[in-house]
């Protein structure tokens, strides 16, 4: 069906108002969806006209999927500002309908959101976007788009800790205290793997299948959801064999859904929690679409309600940050590996990667329940299967410790993962340092780890190449930012610092003139009852350099950072090893501001480790001893060819350029400075 650009259908105003607002008109609209869809198609305008219209004073913003084939023009999610009253979404929708009617347009209100986020879903012409964006209380509007299932018993052995591996999979518990909500296709609940373990809800919000000749064969409609339900809690092939599942159908028989249907499914979960709160809750999102601000915002709202969300990274062999819900910081995002712990390849595609991935899990040739019959099994691959593994592991961890927060759960998943087992050469070169080399595993025990100081590394997005460009990395609300570092592949950067923004501390990195951009790297830790602050020493201008101290009683140094305004600091040569008793201060270049991150917390104990080698050195590392956790990672100040410093697990990595290309002399030293901490009091108490 073709589209007609910039056409309006003029209706008598009384008739339009009767259709839009009257009860009989409302019923007529509900009974004639197909005719309405044709009308929406007829009313679509050309893309070029929208950009000019939105520049004429609209206060809200418009968003759409970056992947054109996945876009669904004519359907829009209108999101209101957070502080709006609960009644405002419906009132704003009715106001939009009335104003559109005066202009001769028909609008259909599809859904009103109250519990998940304030907003509503409408079908309307693109000609009305400018009008909608100008409405009071509107924050932004997002065009609907498609989401897709991400699937194209070594897996159970792989997630069992090496010291406990045996001929039989023996998890610490079955995850019986946890409910898992699965947003997927329908499920064959009578399969022997999951019979009696799955509650098929009455929720269903799916688009029609593509193609007029598509046959909705039951076994095909149920295949993806049935397999994943079996991976999560199947009797024979499941990870958490005691977890109960709730099935919400948001994908059609072709494994295709929409952002809006996923939103409505998430709101269904939100309402269910309000009506009848339960214990720990895990939501499995084995689907992916283009980046969606509104879907990520919805995930954030659920996470605030202590719901754990686990999502597939996507099967596009691409940066996971370009997809949703994988890009949402509050979501635990999972990539896929094979039996050799290598990234999964799916034809010309494969698992997604990058800084938005938290960890990887088994995702190739996974045996699970088949919808072909009640006793059939099938092998499937993809990041959906990987996410199902992590959802099962999360269920067991939450059963052992039901009060775990999302931040605590994520930190434990990272801490207990198998480390440095993935061949990073599979990833694009610019993504290797950003992608975590972690494969999910069960904890070796369910007790005795409460004293452990857990930390993780969070990378920012790339800053861009302009001189004043900055990058920002932030921790989760329940985490403490203990240190901040920066990295630039060109080596042209102006350092980093910790700054307070909106009541939270963030890590900022600064690009330099002629630089290609910079990353900020935050070290985010779980430190209960901590009182942290940053102490800054301004540029000294002369002498050996600047020194920033932790001068408050009982405060301990957890990280050092520095930033400068000039393009070239030059070099100076402080000693690599600090004098004994000087572990509460940071040293910096005389032309830079130096920042000491200092914390007071019960039982906190920290020490500094340094390792230096004469240049040229492509990489220098220093690692904390067992029982100690890396909280700070920095480079020797004033070394001209250093690209930056970052933490990989409990190892501080400093990267540098070849001195032959920089004009520097090999007399310079490349040094990595690590600050290692532990919670001594809690360790003794445990």
UniProtKB/Swiss-Prot annotation:
This is Proprotein convertase subtilisin/kexin type 9. Residues 448-686 are annotated as: C-terminal domain. Monomer. Can self-associate to form dimers and higher multimers which may have increased LDLR degrading activity. The precursor protein but not the mature protein may form multimers. Interacts with APOB, VLDLR, LRP8/APOER2 and BACE1. The full-length immature form (pro-PCSK9) interacts with SCNN1A, SCNN1B and SCNN1G. The pro-PCSK9 form (via C-terminal domain) interacts with LDLR. Interacts (via the C-terminal domain) with ANXA2 (via repeat Annexin 1); the interaction inhibits the degradation of LDLR. Cleavage by furin and PCSK5 generates a truncated inactive protein that is unable to induce LDLR degradation. Undergoes autocatalytic cleavage in the endoplasmic reticulum to release the propeptide from the N-terminus and the cleavage of the propeptide is strictly required for its maturation and activation. The cleaved propeptide however remains associated with the catalytic domain through non-covalent interactions, preventing potential substrates from accessing its active site. As a result, it is secreted from cells as a propeptide-containing, enzymatically inactive protein. Its proteolytic activity is autoinhibited by the non-covalent binding of the propeptide to the catalytic domain. Inhibited by EGTA. One of its GO terms (biological process) is low-density lipoprotein particle receptor catabolic process. The C-terminal domain (CRD) is essential for the LDLR-binding and degrading activities. The catalytic domain is responsible for mediating its self-association. Pfam families: Inhibitor_I9 (PF05922), PCSK9_C1 (PF18459), PCSK9_C2 (PF18464), PCSK9_C3 (PF18463), Peptidase_S8 (PF00082). GO terms for molecular function: apolipoprotein binding; low-density lipoprotein particle binding; serine-type endopeptidase activity; very-low-density lipoprotein particle binding. Keywords: Apoptosis, Autocatalytic cleavage, Calcium, Cholesterol metabolism, Cytoplasm, Disulfide bond, Endoplasmic reticulum, Endosome, Glycoprotein, Golgi apparatus, Hydrolase, Lipid metabolism, Lysosome, Phosphoprotein, Protease, Secreted, Serine protease, Signal, Steroid metabolism, Sterol metabolism, Sulfation, Zymogen. Disulfide bonds join 221-253, 321-356, 455-525, 475-524, 484-507, 532-599, 550-598, 560-586, 606-677, 624-676, 633-652. Residues 75-147 form the Inhibitor I9 domain. Crucial player in the regulation of plasma cholesterol homeostasis. Binds to low-density lipid receptor family members: low density lipoprotein receptor (LDLR), very low density lipoprotein receptor (VLDLR), apolipoprotein E receptor (LRP1/APOER) and apolipoprotein receptor 2 (LRP8/APOER2), and promotes their degradation in intracellular acidic compartments. Acts via a non-proteolytic mechanism to enhance the degradation of the hepatic LDLR through a clathrin LDLRAP1/ARH-mediated pathway. The keyword Disulfide bond applies. Gene3D superfamilies: Peptidase S8 propeptide/proteinase inhibitor I9, Peptidase S8/S53 domain, Proprotein convertase subtilisin/kexin type 9. Its EC number is 3.4.21.-. Residues 1-28 form the signal peptide. The modification Phosphoserine is found at residues 45, 686. Glycans are attached at residue 531. InterPro entries: PCSK9_C1 (IPR041254), PCSK9_C2 (IPR041052), PCSK9_C3 (IPR041051), PCSK9_ProteinaseK-like (IPR034193), Peptidase_S8/S53_dom (IPR000209), Peptidase_S8/S53_dom_sf (IPR036852), Peptidase_S8_subtilisin-like (IPR050131), Peptidase_S8_subtilisin-rel (IPR015500). Its cofactor is Ca(2+).
């Amino acid at each position: 069906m073709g589209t007609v650009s910039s056409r309006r259908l003029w209706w008598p105003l009384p008739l339009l108002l009767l259709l839009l607002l009257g009860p009989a008109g409302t019923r007529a609209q509900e009974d004639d969806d197909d005719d309405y869809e044709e009308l929406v198609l007829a009313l679509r305008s050309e893309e070029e006209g929208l950009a000019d219209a939105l520049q004429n004073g609209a206060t809200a913003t418009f968003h759409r999927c970056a992947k054109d084939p996945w876009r669904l023009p004519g359907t829009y999610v209108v999101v209101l500002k957070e502080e709006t009253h609960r009644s405002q979404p419906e009132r704003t929708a009715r106001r939009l309908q009335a104003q559109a009617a005066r202009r001769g347009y028909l609008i259909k209100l599809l859904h009103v959101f109250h519990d998940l986020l304030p907003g509503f879903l409408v079908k309307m012409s693109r000609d009305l976007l400018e009008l909608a964006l100008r409405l009071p209380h509107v924050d932004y509007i997002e065009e609907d788009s498609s989401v897709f299932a991400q699937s194209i018993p070594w897996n159970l052995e792989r997630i069992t800790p090496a010291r406990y591996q045996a001929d039989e999979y023996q998890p610490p518990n079955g995850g019986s205290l946890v409910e898992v909500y699965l947003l997927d296709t329908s499920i064959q609940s009578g399969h022997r793997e999951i019979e009696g373990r799955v509650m098929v809800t009455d929720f269903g919000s799916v688009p029609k299948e593509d193609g007029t000749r598509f046959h909705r064969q039951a076994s095909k409609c149920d295949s993806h959801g049935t397999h994943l339900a079996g991976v999560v809690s199947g009797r024979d092939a499941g990870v958490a064999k005691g977890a109960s599942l709730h099935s919400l159908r948001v994908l059609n028989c072709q494994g295709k859904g929409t952002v809006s249907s996923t939103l409505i499914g998430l709101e269904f979960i939100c309402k269910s929690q309000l009506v009848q709160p339960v214990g720990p809750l895990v939501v499995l999102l084995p689907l992916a679409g283009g980046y969606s601000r509104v879907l990520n915002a919805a995930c954030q709202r659920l996470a605030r309600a202590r719901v754990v969300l686990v999502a597939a990274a996507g099967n596009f062999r691409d940066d996971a940050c370009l997809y949703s819900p994988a890009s949402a910081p509050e979501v635990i995002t999972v990539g896929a590996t094979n039996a050799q712990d290598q990234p999964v390849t799916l034809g010309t595609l494969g698992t997604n990667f990058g800084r938005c991935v938290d960890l990887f899990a088994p995702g190739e040739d996974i045996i699970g329940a088949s919808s072909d019959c009640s006793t059939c099994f099938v092998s499937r691959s993809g990041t959906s299967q990987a996410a199902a593994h992590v959802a099962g592991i999360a269920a067991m961890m939450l059963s052992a410790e039901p009060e775990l927060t999302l931040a605590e759960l994520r930190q434990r998943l990272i801490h207990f993962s198998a480390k440095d087992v993935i061949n990073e050469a599979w990833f694009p070169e610019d993504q290797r340092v950003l992608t975590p080399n972690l494969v999910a595993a069960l904890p070796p025990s369910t007790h005795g780890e409460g004293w452990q100081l857990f930390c993780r590394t969070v990378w920012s997005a790339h800053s861009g190449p302009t001189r004043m460009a900055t990058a920002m990395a932030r921790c989760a609300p329940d985490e403490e930012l203990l240190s901040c570092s920066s990295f630039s592949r060109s080596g042209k950067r102006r350092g980093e610092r910790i700054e307070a923004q909106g009541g939270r501390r963030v890590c900022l990195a600064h690009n330099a003139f002629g630089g290609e951009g910079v990353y900020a790297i935050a070290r985010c830790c779980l430190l209960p009852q901590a009182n942290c602050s940053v102490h800054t020493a301004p540029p000294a201008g002369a002498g050996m350099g600047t020194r920033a101290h932790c001068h408050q009683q009982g405060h301990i140094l957890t990280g050092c950072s520095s930033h400068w305004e000039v393009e070239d600091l030059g070099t100076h040569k402080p000693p690599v090893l600090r004098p004994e008793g000087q572990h509460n201060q940071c040293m910096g270049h005389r032309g830079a501001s130096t920042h000491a991150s200092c914390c007071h917390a019960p039982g906190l104990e920290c020490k500094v480790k340094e390792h230096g080698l004469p240049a040229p050195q492509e990489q220098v590392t220093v690692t904390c001893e067992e029982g100690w956790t890396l909280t700070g990672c920095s480079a020797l100040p004033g070394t001209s060819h250093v690209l930056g410093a970052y933490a990989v697990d409990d190892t501080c990595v400093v990267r540098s350029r070849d001195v032959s290309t920089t004009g520097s002399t090999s007399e310079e030293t490349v040094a990595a400075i690590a600050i290692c901490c532990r919670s001594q009091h809690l360790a003794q108490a445990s």
